[in-house]
């Protein structure tokens, strides 16, 4: 409608087995909107300006292997910006672990709140810039449960680091005790002190 060419690859269907009822439904939807379905991810690989990953969601807990691992690897090799929907396929939403292989996004559009695995290594490397989009889930929906973690952002800094008096010195605002390192392992202590 806006002059943008869109292609769909049905990642859940292995080549030669495109006979399932879900595949037929997806094919009808694409046909009704005149959206071509491609046979491999590599079809038109140099023409993609945007690659959208929506293969797996936050509930993934098993390792990705076989054909789907190949698809994700092929997607990572495509040109253009890469965007994941909710979480990069192959990333554990709870701990950021890579489950076999993972899509490497430039941006992730996630819903309601960021997922812990998007901020922990190695998941953060695969998530790119995380954009949290509200979808109508209110604080009341959590029935009094508060998140276990929070992400500090630049907008939080003024509250955490109040303006300092120009006549202050290193002893005015308290002192810091660093307990780190061990014999022949002083790297963490040195980094914290700097």
Q: Where would I find each of the regions flagged by the language model?
A:
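Small-residue (G/A/S/T)-rich helix-start motifs and N-terminal tracts that mark the onset
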Residues: 1-13, 18-20, 24, 48, ...
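Short gly/ser/thr-rich secondary-structure transition/capping motifs
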Residues: 32-38, 65, 89-93, 156-162
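Internal gly/pro-rich beta-alpha loop/helix module
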Residues: 48-50, 55-147
